[in-house]
Regions:
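Short, conserved beta-strand segments within well-ordered enzyme catalytic domains
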Residues: 18, 25, 43-46, 66-70
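Extracellular/luminal Protease-associated
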Residues: 38-52
Length: 343
Protein backbone atom coordinates (compact mmCIF):
# COMPACT_ATOMS: atom_id res chain seq x y z
CA UNK A 1 0.00 0.00 0.00
CA UNK A 2 1.22 3.47 -0.86
CA UNK A 3 2.33 5.58 2.12
CA UNK A 4 0.60 8.86 2.92
CA UNK A 5 3.10 11.68 2.37
CA UNK A 6 2.91 15.43 2.95
CA UNK A 7 1.59 18.16 0.69
CA UNK A 8 3.47 21.46 0.69
CA UNK A 9 0.94 24.30 0.64
CA UNK A 10 2.57 27.62 -0.27
CA UNK A 11 0.12 30.39 0.67
CA UNK A 12 2.30 33.48 0.31
CA UNK A 13 1.64 35.29 -2.98
CA UNK A 14 5.23 36.59 -3.05
CA UNK A 15 6.99 33.26 -2.59
CA UNK A 16 9.52 31.50 -4.80
CA UNK A 17 10.86 28.00 -4.32
CA UNK A 18 14.23 26.59 -5.17
CA UNK A 19 16.19 23.36 -4.82
CA UNK A 20 19.26 22.74 -2.69
CA UNK A 21 20.41 19.14 -2.97
CA UNK A 22 17.34 17.07 -2.04
CA UNK A 23 15.61 19.90 -0.18
CA UNK A 24 12.99 22.44 -1.25
CA UNK A 25 13.77 25.95 -0.04
CA UNK A 26 10.90 28.46 0.08
CA UNK A 27 11.62 32.19 -0.13
CA UNK A 28 9.31 35.13 0.53
CA UNK A 29 10.66 38.34 -1.01
CA UNK A 30 14.14 36.75 -1.08
CA UNK A 31 13.95 35.81 2.62
CA UNK A 32 14.08 32.09 3.38
CA UNK A 33 10.94 30.99 5.25
CA UNK A 34 11.10 27.19 5.12
CA UNK A 35 12.76 23.96 4.04
CA UNK A 36 11.32 20.52 3.34
CA UNK A 37 12.98 17.30 2.09
CA UNK A 38 11.71 16.09 -1.28
CA UNK A 39 11.34 12.50 -0.09
CA UNK A 40 8.57 13.56 2.35
CA UNK A 41 6.40 15.08 -0.38
CA UNK A 42 3.64 13.82 -2.66
CA UNK A 43 2.62 17.21 -4.00
CA UNK A 44 3.00 20.99 -3.92
CA UNK A 45 0.06 23.40 -4.02
CA UNK A 46 0.84 27.06 -4.68
CA UNK A 47 -1.69 29.80 -3.92
CA UNK A 48 -0.06 32.57 -5.92
CA UNK A 49 1.41 33.63 -9.22
CA UNK A 50 5.11 33.32 -8.42
CA UNK A 51 6.76 30.03 -9.25
CA UNK A 52 9.38 27.39 -8.90
CA UNK A 53 12.89 27.10 -10.27
CA UNK A 54 13.44 24.85 -13.33
CA UNK A 55 15.72 22.64 -11.22
CA UNK A 56 13.01 22.04 -8.63
CA UNK A 57 10.35 21.46 -11.28
CA UNK A 58 12.57 18.85 -12.92
CA UNK A 59 13.30 17.14 -9.60
CA UNK A 60 9.57 16.99 -8.80
CA UNK A 61 8.78 15.55 -12.24
CA UNK A 62 11.39 12.80 -11.78
CA UNK A 63 9.88 11.85 -8.41
CA UNK A 64 6.24 12.04 -9.52
CA UNK A 65 5.60 15.01 -7.20
CA UNK A 66 2.80 17.02 -8.79
CA UNK A 67 2.75 20.82 -8.66
CA UNK A 68 -0.65 22.50 -8.66
CA UNK A 69 -1.00 26.25 -9.20
CA UNK A 70 -4.09 27.94 -7.77
CA UNK A 71 -5.07 31.60 -7.55
CA UNK A 72 -4.87 33.18 -4.07
CA UNK A 73 -8.59 32.40 -3.70
CA UNK A 74 -8.21 28.74 -4.69
CA UNK A 75 -9.22 28.86 -8.36
CA UNK A 76 -7.42 26.19 -10.38
CA UNK A 77 -4.80 27.51 -12.80
CA UNK A 78 -2.55 24.61 -13.85
CA UNK A 79 -0.99 21.29 -12.87
CA UNK A 80 2.52 20.08 -13.64
CA UNK A 81 3.35 16.38 -13.43
CA UNK A 82 6.08 14.07 -14.66
CA UNK A 83 6.05 11.09 -16.98
CA UNK A 84 2.89 9.09 -17.50
CA UNK A 85 2.87 6.23 -15.02
CA UNK A 86 1.44 2.75 -15.23
CA UNK A 87 0.82 0.20 -17.92
CA UNK A 88 -0.20 1.59 -21.31
CA UNK A 89 -2.67 -1.31 -21.56
CA UNK A 90 -4.56 0.09 -18.57
CA UNK A 91 -5.06 3.45 -20.28
CA UNK A 92 -6.09 1.72 -23.49
CA UNK A 93 -8.73 -0.15 -21.50
CA UNK A 94 -9.82 3.12 -19.88
CA UNK A 95 -10.27 4.83 -23.26
CA UNK A 96 -12.09 1.80 -24.64
CA UNK A 97 -14.46 1.62 -21.65
CA UNK A 98 -15.25 5.34 -21.90
CA UNK A 99 -16.54 4.77 -25.44
CA UNK A 100 -18.58 1.73 -24.39
CA UNK A 101 -22.01 3.10 -23.43
CA UNK A 102 -22.87 0.19 -21.12
CA UNK A 103 -19.59 0.16 -19.18
CA UNK A 104 -19.43 3.95 -19.08
CA UNK A 105 -22.97 4.21 -17.72
CA UNK A 106 -22.28 1.49 -15.16
CA UNK A 107 -19.26 3.32 -13.74
CA UNK A 108 -20.98 6.72 -13.83
CA UNK A 109 -23.99 5.22 -12.09
CA UNK A 110 -21.83 3.82 -9.31
CA UNK A 111 -20.20 7.22 -8.74
CA UNK A 112 -23.58 8.93 -8.38
CA UNK A 113 -24.97 6.14 -6.22
CA UNK A 114 -22.02 6.73 -3.92
CA UNK A 115 -22.64 10.47 -3.92
CA UNK A 116 -26.31 10.20 -2.98
CA UNK A 117 -25.83 7.31 -0.53
CA UNK A 118 -23.16 9.25 1.36
CA UNK A 119 -25.21 12.46 1.29
CA UNK A 120 -28.10 10.56 2.86
CA UNK A 121 -25.70 9.12 5.46
CA UNK A 122 -24.79 12.69 6.46
CA UNK A 123 -28.46 13.52 7.01
CA UNK A 124 -29.14 10.31 8.94
CA UNK A 125 -26.08 10.96 11.14
CA UNK A 126 -27.38 14.45 11.95
CA UNK A 127 -30.78 13.04 12.86
CA UNK A 128 -29.14 10.55 15.17
CA UNK A 129 -26.75 12.95 16.87
CA UNK A 130 -28.53 16.32 16.77
CA UNK A 131 -32.26 15.65 16.39
CA UNK A 132 -33.18 18.27 18.99
CA UNK A 133 -31.07 20.99 17.32
CA UNK A 134 -32.37 20.68 13.78
CA UNK A 135 -35.70 20.69 11.97
CA UNK A 136 -35.89 16.92 12.10
CA UNK A 137 -39.03 16.67 9.98
CA UNK A 138 -37.41 18.52 7.07
CA UNK A 139 -34.25 16.43 7.31
CA UNK A 140 -36.19 13.16 7.59
CA UNK A 141 -38.21 14.07 4.51
CA UNK A 142 -35.04 14.88 2.57
CA UNK A 143 -33.47 11.59 3.66
CA UNK A 144 -36.48 9.62 2.42
CA UNK A 145 -36.38 11.52 -0.88
CA UNK A 146 -32.71 10.62 -1.30
CA UNK A 147 -33.59 6.99 -0.58
CA UNK A 148 -36.10 7.10 -3.44
CA UNK A 149 -33.50 8.82 -5.63
CA UNK A 150 -31.11 5.90 -5.12
CA UNK A 151 -33.60 3.54 -6.76
CA UNK A 152 -34.12 5.92 -9.68
CA UNK A 153 -30.37 6.25 -10.17
CA UNK A 154 -29.93 2.49 -10.07
CA UNK A 155 -32.47 2.13 -12.89
CA UNK A 156 -31.25 5.06 -15.02
CA UNK A 157 -31.04 4.08 -18.70
CA UNK A 158 -28.82 6.89 -19.96
CA UNK A 159 -26.28 9.43 -18.74
CA UNK A 160 -28.71 12.24 -19.46
CA UNK A 161 -31.28 10.59 -17.20
CA UNK A 162 -28.58 9.96 -14.61
CA UNK A 163 -27.51 13.62 -14.60
CA UNK A 164 -31.14 14.63 -14.11
CA UNK A 165 -31.52 12.39 -11.07
CA UNK A 166 -28.19 13.61 -9.72
CA UNK A 167 -29.28 17.24 -10.01
CA UNK A 168 -32.57 16.54 -8.22
CA UNK A 169 -30.78 14.69 -5.41
CA UNK A 170 -28.24 17.50 -5.00
CA UNK A 171 -31.08 20.02 -4.76
CA UNK A 172 -32.74 17.95 -2.03
CA UNK A 173 -29.51 17.55 -0.06
CA UNK A 174 -28.43 21.18 -0.24
CA UNK A 175 -32.01 22.22 0.48
CA UNK A 176 -31.52 21.09 4.10
CA UNK A 177 -27.76 21.66 4.34
CA UNK A 178 -28.30 24.78 6.45
CA UNK A 179 -29.87 22.55 9.12
CA UNK A 180 -26.49 20.85 9.58
CA UNK A 181 -24.87 24.14 10.62
CA UNK A 182 -25.32 24.06 14.40
CA UNK A 183 -23.10 26.95 15.48
CA UNK A 184 -22.34 30.50 14.30
CA UNK A 185 -25.55 30.58 12.29
CA UNK A 186 -25.42 34.35 11.74
CA UNK A 187 -22.01 34.17 10.09
CA UNK A 188 -22.62 30.93 8.19
CA UNK A 189 -25.98 31.06 6.45
CA UNK A 190 -26.45 28.61 3.59
CA UNK A 191 -29.34 29.18 1.19
CA UNK A 192 -28.14 26.99 -1.68
CA UNK A 193 -25.05 25.88 -3.55
CA UNK A 194 -23.43 28.56 -5.69
CA UNK A 195 -19.99 28.85 -7.29
CA UNK A 196 -18.00 30.85 -9.83
CA UNK A 197 -18.16 32.92 -7.72
CA UNK A 198 -19.29 31.66 -4.29
CA UNK A 199 -21.71 34.15 -2.77
CA UNK A 200 -21.53 33.31 0.94
CA UNK A 201 -19.05 32.10 3.54
CA UNK A 202 -20.12 28.45 3.42
CA UNK A 203 -19.92 28.22 -0.36
CA UNK A 204 -16.51 29.90 -0.35
CA UNK A 205 -15.19 27.18 1.95
CA UNK A 206 -16.89 24.37 0.04
CA UNK A 207 -15.43 25.52 -3.28
CA UNK A 208 -11.98 25.85 -1.74
CA UNK A 209 -12.05 22.34 -0.24
CA UNK A 210 -13.51 20.80 -3.42
CA UNK A 211 -10.53 22.21 -5.33
CA UNK A 212 -8.09 20.67 -2.86
CA UNK A 213 -9.82 17.30 -3.08
CA UNK A 214 -10.04 17.35 -6.89
CA UNK A 215 -6.30 17.94 -7.13
CA UNK A 216 -5.69 15.11 -4.67
CA UNK A 217 -7.82 12.72 -6.74
CA UNK A 218 -6.19 13.74 -10.04
CA UNK A 219 -2.76 12.98 -8.58
CA UNK A 220 -3.99 9.61 -7.30
CA UNK A 221 -5.33 8.66 -10.74
CA UNK A 222 -2.01 9.49 -12.37
CA UNK A 223 -0.19 7.48 -9.70
CA UNK A 224 -2.07 4.28 -10.56
CA UNK A 225 -1.71 4.88 -14.31
CA UNK A 226 -5.14 6.25 -15.23
CA UNK A 227 -5.77 9.37 -17.31
CA UNK A 228 -7.48 11.95 -15.06
CA UNK A 229 -8.70 13.92 -18.10
CA UNK A 230 -10.92 11.16 -19.52
CA UNK A 231 -14.08 10.58 -17.51
CA UNK A 232 -17.28 8.58 -17.63
CA UNK A 233 -19.94 10.98 -16.35
CA UNK A 234 -18.23 14.33 -16.85
CA UNK A 235 -17.65 14.91 -20.54
CA UNK A 236 -14.15 15.55 -21.80
CA UNK A 237 -13.17 19.18 -22.11
CA UNK A 238 -9.68 20.62 -22.67
CA UNK A 239 -7.93 21.11 -19.34
CA UNK A 240 -10.68 19.52 -17.24
CA UNK A 241 -9.80 16.51 -15.08
CA UNK A 242 -13.06 14.73 -15.92
CA UNK A 243 -12.25 11.41 -14.24
CA UNK A 244 -11.21 13.21 -11.05
CA UNK A 245 -14.56 15.01 -11.13
CA UNK A 246 -16.27 11.62 -11.48
CA UNK A 247 -14.50 10.17 -8.46
CA UNK A 248 -14.94 13.23 -6.26
CA UNK A 249 -18.71 12.65 -6.29
CA UNK A 250 -18.54 9.79 -3.79
CA UNK A 251 -16.36 11.91 -1.47
CA UNK A 252 -18.16 15.26 -1.52
CA UNK A 253 -20.53 14.72 1.41
CA UNK A 254 -18.54 12.47 3.74
CA UNK A 255 -15.11 13.98 3.13
CA UNK A 256 -15.40 17.62 1.99
CA UNK A 257 -18.84 18.73 3.24
CA UNK A 258 -18.43 17.06 6.60
CA UNK A 259 -14.99 18.65 6.96
CA UNK A 260 -16.39 22.15 6.33
CA UNK A 261 -19.28 21.57 8.73
CA UNK A 262 -16.81 20.44 11.38
CA UNK A 263 -14.76 23.63 11.00
CA UNK A 264 -17.89 25.73 11.51
CA UNK A 265 -19.57 23.72 14.26
CA UNK A 266 -16.36 23.35 16.29
CA UNK A 267 -15.72 27.09 15.86
CA UNK A 268 -12.32 26.49 14.31
CA UNK A 269 -13.23 29.20 11.78
CA UNK A 270 -15.36 32.32 12.16
CA UNK A 271 -16.96 34.96 9.99
CA UNK A 272 -14.26 37.59 10.47
CA UNK A 273 -11.95 36.12 7.83
CA UNK A 274 -14.20 36.68 4.81
CA UNK A 275 -14.67 39.68 2.54
CA UNK A 276 -17.16 40.51 -0.21
CA UNK A 277 -16.25 42.01 -3.59
CA UNK A 278 -18.40 44.39 -5.63
CA UNK A 279 -19.71 41.53 -7.78
CA UNK A 280 -20.92 39.70 -4.66
CA UNK A 281 -18.12 37.13 -4.58
CA UNK A 282 -17.07 36.09 -1.07
CA UNK A 283 -13.34 35.62 -0.49
CA UNK A 284 -11.34 33.90 2.25
CA UNK A 285 -8.35 35.79 3.65
CA UNK A 286 -4.81 34.42 4.00
CA UNK A 287 -5.16 33.54 7.68
CA UNK A 288 -8.30 31.51 7.05
CA UNK A 289 -6.81 29.65 4.09
CA UNK A 290 -3.79 28.71 6.20
CA UNK A 291 -6.03 27.52 9.03
CA UNK A 292 -8.16 25.42 6.66
CA UNK A 293 -5.05 23.89 5.08
CA UNK A 294 -3.65 22.90 8.48
CA UNK A 295 -6.94 21.25 9.44
CA UNK A 296 -7.14 19.57 6.02
CA UNK A 297 -3.72 17.99 6.54
CA UNK A 298 -4.86 16.76 9.97
CA UNK A 299 -8.05 15.33 8.46
CA UNK A 300 -6.01 13.40 5.89
CA UNK A 301 -4.18 11.61 8.70
CA UNK A 302 -7.32 10.31 10.42
CA UNK A 303 -7.69 6.52 10.12
CA UNK A 304 -10.88 4.67 9.18
CA UNK A 305 -11.78 1.14 8.10
CA UNK A 306 -12.36 0.99 4.35
CA UNK A 307 -15.89 -0.44 3.82
CA UNK A 308 -14.85 -2.64 0.87
CA UNK A 309 -11.29 -3.64 1.71
CA UNK A 310 -11.99 -3.96 5.46
CA UNK A 311 -8.53 -2.51 6.09
CA UNK A 312 -7.34 0.50 8.08
CA UNK A 313 -6.59 3.47 5.83
CA UNK A 314 -6.10 7.22 6.28
CA UNK A 315 -8.66 9.60 4.82
CA UNK A 316 -5.89 11.12 2.74
CA UNK A 317 -5.24 7.73 1.11
CA UNK A 318 -8.86 7.18 0.03
CA UNK A 319 -8.46 8.84 -3.41
CA UNK A 320 -5.52 6.54 -4.12
CA UNK A 321 -7.42 3.47 -2.87
CA UNK A 322 -10.46 4.24 -5.03
CA UNK A 323 -8.26 4.96 -8.06
CA UNK A 324 -6.55 1.61 -7.49
CA UNK A 325 -9.92 -0.18 -7.24
CA UNK A 326 -11.10 1.46 -10.47
CA UNK A 327 -7.90 0.32 -12.19
CA UNK A 328 -8.46 -3.23 -10.91
CA UNK A 329 -12.00 -3.20 -12.31
CA UNK A 330 -10.79 -1.99 -15.71
CA UNK A 331 -8.17 -4.75 -15.77
CA UNK A 332 -10.90 -7.32 -15.12
CA UNK A 333 -9.83 -8.19 -11.56
CA UNK A 334 -13.18 -7.04 -10.09
CA UNK A 335 -16.75 -7.52 -11.32
CA UNK A 336 -17.61 -3.87 -10.73
CA UNK A 337 -16.18 -0.62 -9.44
CA UNK A 338 -16.67 -0.70 -5.63
CA UNK A 339 -17.64 2.89 -4.93
CA UNK A 340 -16.85 4.27 -1.45
CA UNK A 341 -19.98 3.88 0.70
CA UNK A 342 -19.40 5.28 4.17
CA UNK A 343 -21.04 3.41 7.05
Amino acid sequence: MKKLLNTLNVTSENSNWGLEGETIVVYDNQTEIGRLPLHNLEGIVSFGYRGTSPALMGACAERNISICYLSPQGKFLARVSGKTRGNVLLREQQYKSCKDEDISLKIAKNCILGKVYNARWILERSLRDHEMQIDSERVKKASLQLKDALELIQNAESKEQLRGYEGEAASIYFGVFNELILQQKKDFIFSGRNKRPPLDNVNAMLSFVYTLLTNQIASALETVGLDPYVGYLHTDRPGRVSLALDLIEEFRAVYADRFVLSLINKKIVNGKNFSRKENGAVLMDDDLRKKVLVEWQNKKKEVITHPFLKEKVEWGMLPYVQAMLLARYLRGDLDGYPVFLWK
